[in-house]
Amino acid sequence: MDRIIEKLDHGWWVVSHEQKLWLPKGELPYGEAANFDLVGQRALQIGEWQGEPVWLVQLQRRHDMGSVRQVIDLDVGLFQLAGRGVQLAEFYRSHKYCGYCGHEMYPSKTEWAMLCSHCRERYYPQIAPCIIVAIRRDDSILLAQHTRHRNGVHTVLAGFVEVGETLEQAVAREVMEESGIKVKNLRYVTSQPWPFPQSLMTAFMAEYDSGEIVIDPKELLEANWYRYDDLPLLPPPGTVARRLIEDTVAMCRAEYE
């Protein structure tokens, strides 16, 4: 439940509006509310980091509003809390009125949900499940440059899970659609909440089975097999894509060195 911010309130401040994050001096604000001119605003505690509260403030600042990507180098736990705040702020902003009856809604006091004051419908933050997979063939890994990544970064394949589809089916479909190959021996690795805008990445490793690379030009600029010790520009540390690549490289080193 949110409340009015008081002078001595302190902690981490996730100040967010329209999927943007307030980053004075390029950093996530930390300290007393008075130092950031937040006294009198409303805040919702969304977690704790190293014993300090993390607050969500739904507010637009005139300056220094940036992307949560700018704080990806934070400790994983704090980055995830910042992402949670951005997603919750957008959820509350976009659910002011009921999609069924059009009446005004209000936030639940017991959970992250919005309740309709008329028909009693209950809405929760939307989460979009995605798969991301590292595909290995002998001493090489399949890496691709996506159309949305025109900075030379090469990464593993990924995509959204469709309605009525299992995660395993999503991997097989996305890999075939984007690269034209089949995979086998699929293994779950980890997951990562990814607030761009509201994804949950489920990460897998797989082995090449058959087929030749035929890219989908709507999704990829190019794709190729890269030997583990001769890789192109990779995604930044802290991303699940980077972890998958590094795990694959470690497996190759263990076998080929």
UniProtKB/Swiss-Prot annotation:
Keywords attached to this entry: Hydrolase, Magnesium, Manganese, Metal-binding, NAD, Zinc
Catalytic activity: a 5'-end NAD(+)-phospho-ribonucleoside in mRNA + H2O = a 5'-end phospho-adenosine-phospho-ribonucleoside in mRNA + beta-nicotinamide D-ribonucleotide + 2 H(+); NAD(+) + H2O = beta-nicotinamide D-ribonucleotide + AMP + 2 H(+); NADH + H2O = reduced beta-nicotinamide D-ribonucleotide + AMP + 2 H(+)
UniProt entry tagged with the keyword Manganese: yes
Top EC category: hydrolase
Residue positions binding Zn(2+): 98, 101, 116, 119
Note accompanying the cofactor annotation: Divalent metal cations. Mg(2+) or Mn(2+).
All copies of domain Nudix hydrolase, residue ranges: 125-248
InterPro entries, per database record: NAD-cap_RNA_hydrolase_NudC, NudC-like_C, NUDIX_hydrolase-like_dom_sf, NUDIX_hydrolase_CS, NUDIX_hydrolase_dom, RNA_Hydrolase_NudC, Znr_NADH_PPase
Pfam families with a match to the protein in the record: NUDIX, Zn_ribbon_NUD
EC number: 3.6.1.-, 3.6.1.22
Function: mRNA decapping enzyme that specifically removes the nicotinamide adenine dinucleotide (NAD) cap from a subset of mRNAs by hydrolyzing the diphosphate linkage to produce nicotinamide mononucleotide (NMN) and 5' monophosphate mRNA. The NAD-cap is present at the 5'-end of some mRNAs and stabilizes RNA against 5'-processing. Has preference for mRNAs with a 5'-end purine. Catalyzes the hydrolysis of a broad range of dinucleotide pyrophosphates.
Family affiliation: Belongs to the Nudix hydrolase family. NudC subfamily.
The protein's name: NAD-capped RNA hydrolase NudC
